[in-house]
Design a protein with these regions (language model features):
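Donor nucleotide-sugar binding/catalytic pocket of nucleotide-sugar-dependent glycosyltransferases
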Residues: 125-171
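Short alpha-helical donor nucleotide-sugar binding micro-motif in glycosyltransferases
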Residues: 131, 231-232, 239-244, 325
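Conserved donor-binding/catalytic core segment of Leloir-type glycosyltransferases
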Residues: 175-208
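Nucleotide-activated donor-binding/catalytic signature segment of Leloir-type glycosyltransferases, i.e.
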Residues: 217-235
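Aromatic "clamp/platform" in nucleotide-sugar-dependent glycosyltransferases that forms part
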Residues: 252
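Short hydrophobic beta-strand element within catalytic cores of glycosyltransferases
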Residues: 269-272
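A charged, aromatic-enriched C-terminal amphipathic alpha-helix characteristic of glycosyltransferases
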Residues: 303-331
Length: 332
């Protein structure tokens, strides 16, 4: 048994791929007998992130975090995010001479550039500074690994993702009956997800958006012909995937795109841009169509084989993802 500490600024009740990944990996690690402790924002005084009020940022967490770390006495520490908790944990580890691993879940420089016009060069300077002392900077895909190494990162290792193919399946009864073909988006409804590139497509059929976020009310007003459901979970989420004919993934800033695997597990071909995330998730998949013209990718996906989508999703497993995570950790 290993005592593993995970420090993360992204945690419940947030709904995103980072939280889903961490929760699932922790579950698998605990089932194998490892002791896993999480230090998360709910343990501290927090303030809302101005652009995303649902994201809570810890205020001056370092002193309390040091006490929490000492109380748990971990054998391995993983810092999952570059927020206040991540920086505090990093500082504590460096002061004590401890080794630690990190992960890169979001293209922070692109996110900051999109939401706050922070120059990409400055964003990557901050990210490189944060991760450079890490013994292993875990990234989700080979294309992201290659991109970061071209930017001068030297400590990256690949940590791919999985999907629950029992929950997300081709047998679920569709939650909605909409005019076909039905094009589905699932995920955060926020500016960096580039959802309007999907909503502006002039194509026959219906568009379904499942998820919540800061742009939801605005998009509901601007696109009255689109069906917005808000967030869905578990069996209900699977049923909403099954309401669609294809899945559209318009983001150009994700490092992976877990929702693509969930959609394919439900038998939905995927249309996306040829960027980091889709380039890896959809590689060698005949049911994944990528094009800089998103409408063209959608039209191709509508002709793709649903069984091929499901078969591709079956190649990704959470146990394998958890094993990779564990092997990437380093003793203090």
């Amino acid at each position: 048994m290993t005592k593993i500490l995970i420090v993360t600024d992204a945690w419940e009740p947030q709904v995103n791929g980072v939280v889903t990944t961490l929760l699932t990996v922790i579950k698998h690690l605990q089932e194998k007998g490892h002791s896993v402790e999480v230090i998360s924002p709910d343990m501290f005084t927090t303030v809302p992130l101005p652009v995303y009020p649902e994201i809570k940022l810890a205020v001056f967490p370092k002193r309390k975090m040091a006490r929490l770390i000492d109380a748990f006495a971990p054998e391995k520490i993983h810092i999952a995010t570059e927020g206040p908790l991540g920086w505090a944990a990093r500082a504590i580890c460096l002061k004590k001479g401890w080794r630690f691993s990190t992960s890169y879940h979001t293209k922070f420089p692109e996110f900051a550039n999109e939401t706050a016009r922070i120059p990409l060069r400055l964003g990557y300077f901050v990210v490189k500074h944060f991760h450079r002392k890490s013994s292993a900077m875990m990234v989700a895909t080979k294309s992201l690994d290659d991109d970061l190494r071209e930017r001068g990162f030297t400590n990256t290792v690949t940590w791919t993702r999985g999907v629950d193919t029992e929950l997300f399946n081709c047998q679920s009864k569709p939650a909605l009956k909409l005019e076909k073909p039905v094009m589905v988006y699932v995920g955060r409804v926020s500016v960096e997800k580039n959802i309007e590139a999907f909503l502006n497509l002039d194509l026959p059929g219906s568009k379904l958006v499942v998820g919540g976020g800061p742009q939801l009310k605005k998009l509901q007003r601007n696109y009255p012909n689109v069906t917005f459901t808000g967030p869905k979970f578990g069996d209900e989420l699977a049923a909403h995937y099954r309401s669609g004919d294809i899945f559209v993934f318009p983001s150009q800033t994700d490092t992976f795109g877990l929702v693509m695997l969930e959609a394919m597990a439900c038998g939905l071909p995927v249309a996306a841009y040829p960027v980091t995330g889709p380039l890896d998730v959809l590689a060698e998949c005949t049911a994944g169509k990528m094009d800089w013209d998103l409408a063209k990718a959608v039209k191709q996906a509508l002709k793709a084989d649903q069984k091929a989508a499901r078969d591709h999703a079956l190649k990704f497993s959470w146990p394998a993802c958890s094993d990779t995570f564990l092997s990437n950790l380093t003793p203090l």
